[in-house]
Amino acid sequence: MYETNSYDIAIIGTGPAGISAAINAAIRKKKFILFGSENLSAKVERSHLISNYPALPEISGKELNERLAAHLKQMDIVITAERITGVYNMGKYFMLLADQKEYKADAVILATGAQTVKEIKGERELLGRGVSYCATCDGNFYKDKTIAVISDNKESEEEVDFLAGLARKVYFYPSYKTDYSKENVEHLTSPAVSVDGERHADGITLKDGAHIAVDGVFFLKQSVSADVLLGGLEMSNGSIAVDRDMSTNIKGCFACGDCTGKPYQIAKAIGEGNTALHSAITYLSALKSKIE
């Protein structure tokens, strides 16, 4: 009997790797949850033509995304469209945080994709001290204060809305085209190059040299560095270090797809997703044997 929000496997990411893992989890009748965007992979969607996927020559990224979505629907796999802001290794299980909710899983598969937006100076150093990746988690700390919000995806504008409803002033820099507008939101035309402050974030410096004083900085990214998401995760050249079975240095945690490094290929991602899922099942079986 499972508790509410308790799963065998949590899969983070709805690119080809995460979808591959989810499909195989459904086939193996595991209790799992799939986190990600209902629009699946923006990277795949933008691909004009994919010519190296076996048996599907010259398929567009848009069509491939549509076929992946249809496969999920056919298998009654539901996407939980919540952004995971933290994964915590509790020893024999993992706790995942998404907004105000908690999810428990015995194993985790990271299919978060390659980090497309590089961290800026001070971002990691001041994380938790004025820098946040989660609007709903930390927004209430900035009621009637001045904040900066840096976003790389339109889907996060609901979170921008949430923050604008709390803060006195919001400096907003979207790295994409948008007509988002709100009375207390000022659009920045120059990107931030650093978060300033010693013990706590107190401002940002822009590429044009301007300095803006703020009380906090929110980065609303499609994906954050995996070792920020899960502390203690071993990295190699900016990617998650994995063995051939897609296991990481943390027991029960597996990774697949672009987040494990080059080559960034759809066929590779799908194969790794399959491997990660079967390795997770092997891990769960061993875990169950120890308990019994």
Predicted regions and their residues:
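Structured catalytic cores of enzymes that bind and process phosphorylated ligands/cofactors
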Residues: 2, 7-33, 96-98, 187-196, ...
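A Rossmann-like FAD-binding core segment of flavoenzymes
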Residues: 72-90, 95-97, 103, 165-244, ...
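FAD-binding core/adjacent interface of flavoenzyme oxidoreductases
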Residues: 1-12, 79-144, 217-218, 241-244, ...
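Short loop/helix-cap segments at secondary-structure boundaries that form the rim of catalytic
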Residues: 25, 46, 120-124, 140-142, ...
